[in-house]
């Protein structure tokens, strides 16, 4: 069992120590701001910030410090997930989880069991199915769902969030029929008679969203607390929240004013927000203790590879009539980029397919030439399948690829089918980016993938799944070293949020955000990195999580 310390500790309590704190007898690692790996056995922090790292000589320098026994555990900076969905994670923890389903039938039985336990809920909502892992690999249908739950609407998001599986009741409520047109950037999957089958892809999901029950503040509280509890237990002390609406924007501001955020959050305002212009005019949001920083916008280029929604320059190798979907129309890119960059906000653009990536790079170049914004550390979120000629442009344009290592190990079972061997030369190209000097910010894209950052570190270094398959790793030339992976989850993730001077390491003056873990990831076999257990998580010198014995 795990024990989470109260997430609503006052931030001030982290800043009013009577004496410095000194943790000793640790195997500590951090990167300095130049990227050099430093090892240490002792660390002293005061007022929530690191004041020294070193060896036993710190005992003489700080004789009155409060002593903390490190018990020879490994100490690392708190890990940063550079792309996750905080409320989505909390929501998934409170809904039916279909990631372990072995077939469509297995999934509907899980949904039925959940619906029976939650009879008071007006909708049955879940997430995590992946037809690629099921026999036949075909999309499931509304008719199958109807056999098990037909008295209330059901909405089940695919593992990547880019498709939803719904029952007939949900289609009826949304008014989706044979005559309903596909919305721009979306697709209603139909049978050979044109009738909706129960699968909605990308923007077609919006036809259903407006009918979902409104999210209350109590629901937001439950979601944030559940997500925070899990992330702290996995060693994550800061997360870049990839796409929030006005309700969550206001809620985060309320929680930070109450000194009750469970971890540091760097939210990206969703470009689809109806009040985007209003929020941009309010300027950046930054609290004095660096728990909340809002200075970026998440825009949406295309869908996902698994659902064949990623926008490709040439058709899918396994679907010759399909180029994928542009979620934001090409003609809308210029005004959107100009708006965001013109207000001095970092623009983080979701692009998975090579067409979406090229369009993003083209528009960044155009907007930079006219209104500036090149220094804002703009990002491409995912940057998964890229034409090899476009990779150097990331460096030229100062665009940070924000990438998720476990996407590669999850997608390796279908990526070649989708795009063919030739296009894989520019896919999941972490080492290529690093060799050209591009900082790579690593994350997980939770709840699409599991949030555990040690799963990401393992995938980045081995290019294997947690069964250590394939033997030599998938496209092993793009694997990174442990140090490079560590940097992607610390210093470079902090850099991607303009926070490298306060987070991402444990050098003097940075916040004392750190974790104790049970094994040395720099010394063990890379295949075992994913097994790492977090023993303690600290933020600003306050312990926020302890793993129970």
Where do the language-model regions lie?
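Acidic (Asp/Glu)-rich catalytic clusters
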Residues: 256-259, 283-292, 373, 394-396
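Non-cysteine beta-strand/loop elements that form the S-adenosyl-L-methionine
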Residues: 291-309, 398-409
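Sec-dependent signal peptide recognition
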Residues: 2-8
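Beta-strand-rich structural segments
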Residues: 27-29
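Short, conserved secondary-structure segments in the cores of folded domains
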Residues: 33, 41, 502-505
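Divalent metal-binding segments
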Residues: 20-24, 35-280, 295, 299-356, ...
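N-terminal signal peptide c-region/cleavage motif recognized by signal peptidases
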Residues: 13-14, 18
């Amino acid at each position: 069992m795990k024990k989470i310390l109260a997430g609503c500790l006052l931030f001030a309590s982290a800043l009013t120590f009577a004496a410095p704190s000194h943790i000793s007898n640790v195997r500590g690692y951090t990167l300095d701001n130049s990227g050099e790996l430093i090892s240490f056995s002792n660390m002293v922090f005061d007022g929530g910030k690191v004041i020294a790292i070193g060896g036993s000589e710190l005992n003489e320098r700080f004789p009155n410090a409060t002593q903390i026994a490190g018990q020879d555990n490994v100490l690392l900076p708190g890990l940063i997930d550079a792309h996750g969905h905080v409320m989505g994670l909390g929501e998934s923890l409170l809904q039916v989880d279909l990631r372990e389903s072995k077939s469509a039938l297995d999934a509907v039985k899980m949904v039925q069991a959940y619906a029976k336990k939650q009879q008071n809920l007006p909708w049955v909502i879940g997430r995590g199915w992946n037809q690629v892992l099921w026999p036949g690999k075909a999309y499931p249908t509304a008719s199958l769902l109807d056999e098990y739950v037909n008295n209330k609407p059901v909405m089940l998001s695919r593992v990547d969030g880019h498709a939803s599986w719904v029952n007939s009741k949900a289609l009826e409520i949304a008014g989706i029929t044979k005559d309903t047109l596909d919305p721009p950037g979306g697709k209603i999957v139909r049978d050979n008679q044109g009738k909706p089958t129960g699968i909605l892809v990308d923007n077609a999901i919006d036809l259903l969203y407006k009918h979902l029950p409104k999210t209350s503040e109590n629901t937001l509280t439950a979601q944030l607390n559940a997500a925070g509890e899990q992330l702290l237990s996995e060693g994550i002390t800061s997360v870049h929240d990839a796409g929030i609406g006005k309700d969550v924007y206001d809620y985060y501001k309320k929680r930070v004013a109450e000194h009750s955020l469970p971890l540091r959050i760097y939210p990206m305002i969703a470009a689809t927000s109806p009040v985007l212009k209003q929020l941009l005019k309010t300027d950046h949001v930054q609290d004095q203790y660096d728990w909340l920083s809002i200075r970026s916008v998440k825009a949406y280029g295309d869908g996902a590879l698994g659902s064949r929604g990623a926008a490709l320059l040439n058709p899918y190798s396994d679907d010759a009539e399909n180029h994928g979907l542009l979620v934001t129309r090409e003609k809308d890119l210029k005004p959107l980029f100009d708006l965001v960059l013109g207000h001095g906000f970092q623009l983080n653009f979701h692009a998975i397919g090579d067409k979406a990536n090229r369009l993003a790079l083209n528009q960044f170049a155009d907007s930079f030439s006219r209104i500036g914004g090149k220094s804002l550390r703009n990002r491409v979120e995912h940057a998964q399948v890229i034409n090899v000629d476009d990779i150097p442009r990331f460096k030229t344009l100062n665009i940070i690829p924000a990438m998720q290592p476990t996407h590669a190990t999850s997608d390796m079972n279908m990526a070649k089918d989708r795009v063919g061997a030739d296009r894989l030369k520019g896919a999941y190209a972490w080492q290529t980016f690093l060799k050209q000097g591009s900082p790579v910010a690593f994350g997980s894209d939770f709840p699409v993938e599991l949030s555990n950052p040690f799963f990401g570190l393992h995938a980045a270094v081995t290019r294997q799944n947690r069964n250590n398959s394939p033997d030599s790793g998938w496209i092993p030339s793009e694997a990174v070293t442990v140090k490079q992976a560590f940097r992607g989850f610390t210093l470079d993730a902090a850099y991607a949020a303009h926070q490298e001077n306060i987070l991402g390491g444990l050098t003097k003056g940075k916040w004392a955000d750190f974790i104790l873990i049970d094994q040395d990831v720099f010394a063990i076999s890379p295949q075992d990195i994913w097994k790492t257990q977090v023993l303690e998580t600290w933020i600003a010198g306050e312990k926020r999580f302890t793993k129970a014995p």
